[in-house]
Amino acid sequence: MDEQYNPREVEQTARTFWETNETFKVKEEPGKPKYYCLSMFPYPSGKLHMGHVRNYTIGDVISRYQRMQGKNVMQPMGWDAFGLPAENAAIANKSAPAKWTRSNIDYMKNQLKQLGFGYDWSRELATCDPEYYRWEQWFFARLYEKGLVYKKMSTVNWDPVDQTVLANEQVVDGRGWRSGALVEQKKIPQWFIRITDYAEELLNDLEDMEGWPEQVKTMQRNWIGKSVGTELTFPLKEQEGGLTVYTTRPDTLMGVSYMAVAAEHPLAKAAAERHRDVAEFVDQCRNSKVAEAELATMEKKGIDTGFKAIHPLTQEEIPVWVANFVLMDYGTGALMAVPGHDERDHEFAVKYKLPIKQVIAPNDSRDIDIQEQAFTEKGVLVSSGKYSGLTSEEAFEEIADYLEAQGIGKRTVNYRLRDWGVSRQRYWGAPIPMMTLEDGTEMPVPDDQLPVRLPEDVEMDGVQSPIKADPEWCKTEYNGQPATLETDTFDTFMESSWYYARFCSPNYDKGMLDPAAANYWLPVDQYIGGIEHAILHLLYARFFHKLLRDVGLVNSSEPFKRLLTQGMVLAETYYRNEANGGKTWYNPADVTVERDGKGQVVRAVLKSDGEPVEIGGVTKMSKSKNNGIDPQAIIDQHGADTVRLFMMFAAPPEQSLEWSDSGVEGAHRFLKRLWRMVNEHTAGGDAPAVDPANLNGAQKDLRRKTHETIAKVSDDISRRLTFNTAIAAVMELLNEVGRLSDDEPQSRAVRQEALDTAVLVLSPIVPHICHNLWQALGHSDAVVDASWPVADESAMVRSEIEVVLQVNGKVRAKENVPADIGKADLEKLALENENVMRFTDGKTVRKVIVVPGKLVNVVAN
């Protein structure tokens, strides 16, 4: 082997071997235990960032470890290729999104190969490939036939100048990103999938998902948002019908002091026709789209409609207001306001001087002032007529019973979850496979006409979707009759909701999935990705899996057995304040820093002009702060194994990882040291086999350390997924190897065993260098095909142990003794120890406390 570690050559050798031997290509082997490891596939944005590298390194380490356990391991990779950024890039570069996307895929695929990830590239898929989305279109038609798809009017961002629909991210400060026009809220017909039909199952199945982080399950529970309450109707004064509301707190019914309706509610529209100020307010609400997440923090505004509702228990008249915090899409678009016992209702009541009544008192003797602050806990009813004195729980039941008996209310279960709107008015997505006949009938495109292909050779004008702008594209026919194709495309979450299943049979052309392959590989054993996908992607994928099950394509009910959500990659930020009040951010690679003794940056200057820059602190790597580190630059400088080792060593996978140049250099030094140790060892020729019966103390110590390391690393990687502590254990082992430097045959034997072990257990983490070192250590097989080492229990048994000797609780000596020494012998040894005798001389020994295997404490006075 070469004396010097040359990452470029070493890594090329390993990659050539894997590619030539198709090492990672797998097929179903029914008799062999399978392991399907999947990292969330990337959007082909142009080049990999460090977040990708961290995610995919974790996945590759787990995959290679499982392979060494003798499992049939599948680790595929593909591209989540549709989406808005491709359209924006195409407009900027005056090219077609397909061309930009495919060129990015080529570049990023090469980067993934350079990092040595063990992917089965024969399974590669891109979601923009018609052979992929044709099956999504086929599946949508099946869902339509099952009644799980419907169309309804839904609100979009409308640019009145460009006459086009804008995505939320194309609305900047309420204006269209290109035209600058004030964006309006407009209702258009859109397609929805009934995820709410599966709400209960999606919620209940979380209970059995032991391999998922509790945090993610909680986020999904909250998103599904199951609640039990009462739906009741307040009659309207001098109006037909009534106001139906849903409440989880019927116990607070006597505290209602106003009603609030959404701007789109029929009652708000009726009031707008009568009062100009109401009409203006309703228009204002309609054009300022509010995301549900913003409701809590935004300013609450409203206006009195002039209508009155009648309280169902007291017959009191209650004013009906239009309020900007009530959404038509949630519940009934109306709510009963109880300002004494709800913070939002309280804030609104204070602002508009509406009555605030107390109807719940604390269970204890606390003093509360309901005018100052809402009391939102449950308690005991007060000022509630015949219900006063009941607990909130008792009143819930009694009031619900009364409303049901009177026919004005009923107990209901409600979900926060809304049906999934899958229509997008964008071009770069999979066309929705629906068509409209001349008589207005809507139906799925017949299977024999799929895929509905997206034309790829297009020009983007930045305004209209090319398929909406081309009147010819949407022309088709059905049974000889003219028909018109839908020009909306699918939400890109559709593609990522089933890609994991298509990887099982990516080239299967007889159906969406090959059931035999799907049921062999699924569910995914380990899924890895960022926690930002906890709700939408992971919930949609769970939903899709149940749909796949219900059309008979898979047997299982959940897609992912274990989920690991890796932490973010952070880096220092540097900037200068500009005259206009903005900031210019500088990349860490362009800045020279000085650090204090603790490694904190204390001064930073820009390399180009030598002038100081401000230190902005450590934050997530991002384009906006320009603090991303290009993985390619680090690979070119130090090699892929160094990047992989740093990523795995710097932090446990779930925690944030702070980028550190010195940490990267430390990882590189460790690999050079490992190379040098193997080189020095192999220069002495072949080592004999270990003869456990003929080892001296130092040789036994190294052998014990080797097998303790195997036990620790196995547990760290398989159960705990703490790769950083596994690497630290190997570093300790190599320190021990360095201490046993003599050339006795059995010293060489235990050293060979230790180095073999280090290379084996590091091979999932730094596979290129280990591929070369394994062969240098004299093995004819490849390390990627080797089995994971097994700890030898007998090697870990200590023949000698160190015992601490104390007098009156203070350490006075340490002795090496046989591991099986008895209590009496230990006591004798302690009392005869020179140092112990020095501290007991002239004193009476009162008692001797022996803790076997640990210490002896002599009590004397």
Curated annotation (Swiss-Prot):
Q: Report which reactions are catalysed by this protein.
A: tRNA(Leu) + L-leucine + ATP = L-leucyl-tRNA(Leu) + AMP + diphosphate
Quick one: which residues bind ATP?
623
Entry GO terms, CC? cytosol
Motif 'HIGH' region in this chain: 42-52
Motif 'KMSKS' region boundaries: 620-624
Assigned keywords, A-Z: Aminoacyl-tRNA synthetase, ATP-binding, Cytoplasm, Ligase, Nucleotide-binding, Protein biosynthesis
Enzyme class, spelled out: ligase
| SUPFAM superfamilies tied to this protein | Anticodon-binding domain of a subclass of class I aminoacyl-tRNA synthetases (SSF47323), Nucleotidylyl transferase (SSF52374), ValRS/IleRS/LeuRS editing domain (SSF50677)
Q: Where is the signal peptide?
A: none
Alphabetized PANTHER family for the sequence:
LEUCINE--TRNA LIGASE, MITOCHONDRIAL, LEUCYL-TRNA SYNTHETASE
- Family indicated by similarity: Belongs to the class-I aminoacyl-tRNA synthetase family.
Name of this protein: Leucine--tRNA ligase
Please spell out the taxonomic lineage of the organism that makes this protein. Answer: Bacteria, Pseudomonadati, Pseudomonadota, Gammaproteobacteria, Pseudomonadales
